[in-house]
């Protein structure tokens, strides 16, 4: 019999950001205007010096402007913009420099707190710099002393943006043009973590001193019920609680409420800052020890050790009158406090799959939580 060989998964493929797409398409359109050159591909230089070639879907003259488009290729990253058509429309202008406009599918900033001013198109600083550098270099090569008006759009971007954090951040009408390196690293989650930071920045800039970081929809609903907290102060952190806790070292708030499913809160209690199953797991022996600390007898501890899920361990404890949920929240609270500044009041809530509270710590004992 032939020996089995270890499976060797293919390496994940990197992609290119919407900022790279915008740079390539704006350069191709500008080159058509200045040189009369129609391109089916264009080469750009990424911020760290790497040269990449990007294929164009079209490059054409339309009235008094040129436009070009490319399909966003995010590689193996599950990016909402993967496969979207990113386009640039470029007009020549008398004034030197580059003026950016939001086309269809690209959002506009409507709230303070982001790196872009209110009213600006949601084209982030690095993509702006990439486009500006490429366009000014082209102008110098062609002896052109004027400037460029650049409109960036994403086909279907307004609908795609509803699947992102943009509406909550006050970026309305479409997507953001993003990227710091020009490259999308598969499953790096850099964009998601950046949106968490932006959410905190927007909330605090707009005067909210109490934010609630939630793992999902059910925990957000719980925080709305407990505090009637507005959406702008609800931070959709998913599994990235560490992104919230570390950012509060740089951004000041008075109070942080953390709310999530019992299983995820138990991971936080064990000192994990990425709560996804790829990076952390439920520690049943630890749950059994914590249960023992609040009254679980040897029999219940053995049941917890044999449990299939954290929810089952919680249910067993509740049936025995053992407040495992509160104890887990207490440990999660202590860990969170070890990360954020001492000036931040922290509280932790754990919920079941129906959104009911099953544990809490750091909560004002004078206030009834239902």
Swiss-Prot record:
Pfam families in alphabetical order: CbiD (PF01888)
E.C. numbers: 2.1.1.195
Keywords, sorted A to Z: Cobalamin biosynthesis, Methyltransferase, S-adenosyl-L-methionine, Transferase
Biological or metabolic pathway of the protein: Cofactor biosynthesis; adenosylcobalamin biosynthesis; cob(II)yrinate a,c-diamide from sirohydrochlorin (anaerobic route): step 6/10
InterPro entries (UniProt xref): CbiD, CbiD_sf
Source superkingdom: Bacteria
Chain segments annotated as coiled-coil in the UniProt record: none
HAMAP family per UniProt: CbiD
Name assigned to this protein: Cobalt-precorrin-5B C(1)-methyltransferase
Organism listed in the record: Pseudomonas syringae pv. syringae (strain B728a)
């Amino acid at each position: 019999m032939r020996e089995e060989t270890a499976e060797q998964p293919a390496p994940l493929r990197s992609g290119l950001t919407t900022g790279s797409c915008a740079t390539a398409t704006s350069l191709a359109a500008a080159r058509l205007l200045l040189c009369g050159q129609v391109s089916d591909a264009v080469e750009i230089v990424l911020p760290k010096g790497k040269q990449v070639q990007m294929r164009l879907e079209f490059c054409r003259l339309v009235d008094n402007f040129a436009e070009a488009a490319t399909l966003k290729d995010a590689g193996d990253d599950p990016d909402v913009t993967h496969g979207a058509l990113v386009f640039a429309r470029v007009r020549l202008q008398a004034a030197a420099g580059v003026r950016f406009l939001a086309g269809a599918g690209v959002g506009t900033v409507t709230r303070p707190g982001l790196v872009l001013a209110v009213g600006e198109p949601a084209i982030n600083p690095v993509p702006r710099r990439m486009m500006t550098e490429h366009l000014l270099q082209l102008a110098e090569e062609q002896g052109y002393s004027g400037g460029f008006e650049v409109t960036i759009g994403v086909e279907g971007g307004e609908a795609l943006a509803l699947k992102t954090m943009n509406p909550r951040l006050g970026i309305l009408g479409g997507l953001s043009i993003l990227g710091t390196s020009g490259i999308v690293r598969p499953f790096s989650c850099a964009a998601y973590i950046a949106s968490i930071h932006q959410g905190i920045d927007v909330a605090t800039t707009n005067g909210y001193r109490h934010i609630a970081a939630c793992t999902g929809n059910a925990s957000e609903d719980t925080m709305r019920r407990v505090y009637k907290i507005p959406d702008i102060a609800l931070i959709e952190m998913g599994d990235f609680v560490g992104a919230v806790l570390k950012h509060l070292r740089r951004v000041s708030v008075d109070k942080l409420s953390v709310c999530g499913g019992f299983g995820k809160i138990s991971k936080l209690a064990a000192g994990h800052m990425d709560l996804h199953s790829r990076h952390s797991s439920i520690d049943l022996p630890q749950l059994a020890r914590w249960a023992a600390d609040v009254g679980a007898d040897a029999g219940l501890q053995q049941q917890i050790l044999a449990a299939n899920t954290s929810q089952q361990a919680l249910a067993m404890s509740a049936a025995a009158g053992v407040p495992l949920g509160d104890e887990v929240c207490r440990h999660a609270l202590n860990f969170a406090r070890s990360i954020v500044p001492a000036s931040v009041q922290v509280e932790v809530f754990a919920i079941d799959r129906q959104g009911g509270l099953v544990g809490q710590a750091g909560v004002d004992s004078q206030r009834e939580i239902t």
